[in-house]
């Protein structure tokens, strides 16, 4: 977002200079993270439509089965101070109460472990069937988060001489800081078996996440997302086996947090179990400043699905001034498995499948 665009200008200046040591660049990068409060912005996933419990708590139980999702993102591997994010979630639908329950764990490492965070979230959703083809889900989420900053991983300028890094103690204060807080979020989605659209609001209580005892509230984040699935399979050939279908699904995700906003839009298609997709991230008509365009990356996806298993790999091609050659882009992989349990014959409950990542 905006802080990343600002950082791209600084990084370009640093990497163009042959006199700047790679460790000094790493130090400057981490200090930018700490002093600009870039850590106050949330993690973003390119495969937002697949990591549904992170997208909106109302998706908890939306598969009407038990579902497990694993997600891994490696951002900017070409830099010393890269980002590594891992998430794991499990959710289940309770037919009798028309409710979904989800549990999500997230681990994020920034700046080669200088800044890190761990989050544990519990989600609840309720499903309301409006008509035979339309349903609404409302969800809430409570999160316990711990964030850390460790200066021991940094190398400071007074530890360098003309011969390079000395390893001697620095006059800068080393330290390890931690902050814990509770976070509240909520969301809702309207959907049928072909489309979905949702609104989610995160950090409703704007918790204080300062490491140093002052006030640094986490800004509220608002996301609006949706998608529509077009089934291109000949109606005469359509069967109950979704693996044989040919579908195209345009999706979008708009998010706004603090003074920054971003838009992801694109589509993915499924042809006999093979998935291909492409998205653009940015708002090209918007400029934060002269010469500072909101133009971030192109995301390409390849994947495979079979019955309850879905695997997707995506790569972000950086198109901003923080160019691909310096950052190495971003890698992301999602593995989703839905445990398909046959319905009981005693009672048939009206269910509308939500077309998330299908």
What is the predicted role of each segment?
Residues 41-358:
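Subset of outer-membrane beta-barrel
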Residues 1-42, 340-358:
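Cleavable N-terminal export/targeting peptides
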């Amino acid at each position: 977002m905006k802080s990343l665009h600002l950082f791209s200008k600084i990084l370009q200046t640093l990497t163009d200079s042959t006199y700047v040591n790679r460790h000094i660049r790493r130090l400057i990068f981490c200090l930018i993270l700490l002093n600009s409060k870039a850590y106050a912005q949330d993690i973003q996933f390119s495969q937002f439509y697949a990591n549904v419990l992170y997208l909106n708590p109302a998706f908890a139980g939306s598969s009407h089965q038990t579902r497990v999702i694993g997600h891994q993102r490696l951002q900017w591997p070409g830099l010393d101070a890269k980002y590594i994010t891992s998430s794991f979630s499990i959710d289940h639908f309770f037919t009798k109460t028309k409710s979904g329950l989800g549990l999500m764990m997230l681990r994020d490492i920034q700046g080669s472990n200088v800044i890190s965070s761990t989050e544990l979230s519990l989600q609840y959703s309720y499903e309301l069937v409006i008509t035979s083809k339309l349903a609404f889900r409302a969800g809430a989420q409570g999160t316990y988060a711990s964030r850390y900053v460790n200066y021991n991983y940094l190398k400071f300028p007074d530890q360098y001489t003309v011969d390079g890094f000395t390893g001697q103690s620095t006059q800068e204060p080393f330290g390890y800081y931690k902050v814990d807080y509770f976070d509240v979020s909520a969301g809702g989605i309207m959907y049928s078996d072909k489309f979905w659209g949702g609104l989610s609001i995160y950090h409703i209580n704007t918790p204080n996440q300062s490491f140093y005892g002052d006030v640094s509230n986490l800004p509220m984040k608002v996301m609006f997302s949706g998608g529509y699935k077009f089934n291109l399979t000949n109606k005469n050939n359509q069967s109950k086996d979704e693996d044989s279908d040919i579908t195209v699904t345009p999706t979008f995700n708009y998010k706004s947090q603090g003074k920054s906003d971003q838009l992801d839009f694109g589509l993915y298609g499924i042809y006999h179990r093979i998935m291909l997709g492409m998205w653009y991230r940015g708002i090209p008509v918007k400029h934060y400043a002269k010469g500072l365009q909101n133009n971030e990356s192109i995301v390409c996806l390849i994947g495979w699905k079979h019955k309850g298993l879905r695997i997707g790999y995506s790569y972000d091609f950086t198109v901003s001034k923080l160019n691909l050659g310096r950052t190495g882009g971003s890698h992301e992989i999602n593995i989703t498995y839905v445990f398909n349990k046959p319905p009981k014959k005693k009672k048939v409950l009206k269910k509308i499948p939500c077309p998330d990542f299908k």
